[in-house]
């Protein structure tokens, strides 16, 4: 674009103003322009922040319910995986007995799975909402479950 000089100043200024005012009107219209989208986003952020405050203001029992559901889901997944391992170990053990070779000692899982389930359910019931240190109890519960895994691999659980 050439520099503004005395002869082309008016035409360049005219086209510049026409272009930018058209662009400005397109941006600032009340319909679907960019500012309309920004207003929608501002309203959405206000609603989300308001919703977040209402979620945080609920009683802590709902957090306990979420925690219990999470633990029960974890226990059910763990029990399902133990059941599948049990089936696999039985199949491999049958093949080993048939060939007179013991391939796997089943990791002590047949005797340990029931005791493991009992200990997990006991630890979950121990972390009740009436406990004042519920997060410490859950942390202890997680450590107990890890300890159960270590014992489970070595033999039976008493």
Swiss-Prot record:
Main location: mitochondrion
EC main group: translocase
Catalyzed chemical reaction(s): ATP + H2O + 4 H(+)(in) = ADP + phosphate + 5 H(+)(out)
Membrane topology: Single-pass membrane protein
GO BP annotations, alphabetical order: ATP biosynthetic process; proton transmembrane transport
Stretches that traverse the bilayer: 7-27
Residues of the signal peptide: none
Cellular component, GO annotation: mitochondrial membrane; proton-transporting ATP synthase complex
EC number: 7.1.2.2
Pfam families to which the protein is assigned, alphabetical: YMF19, YMF19_C
GO molecular function: ATP binding
Subunit and interaction comment: F-type ATPases have 2 components, CF(1) - the catalytic core - and CF(0) - the membrane proton channel. CF(1) has five subunits: alpha(3), beta(3), gamma(1), delta(1), epsilon(1). CF(0) has three main subunits: a, b and c.
Family the UniProt entry places it in: Belongs to the ATPase protein YMF19 family.
Name assigned to this protein: Putative ATP synthase protein YMF19
Species the sequence originates in: Raphanus sativus (Radish)
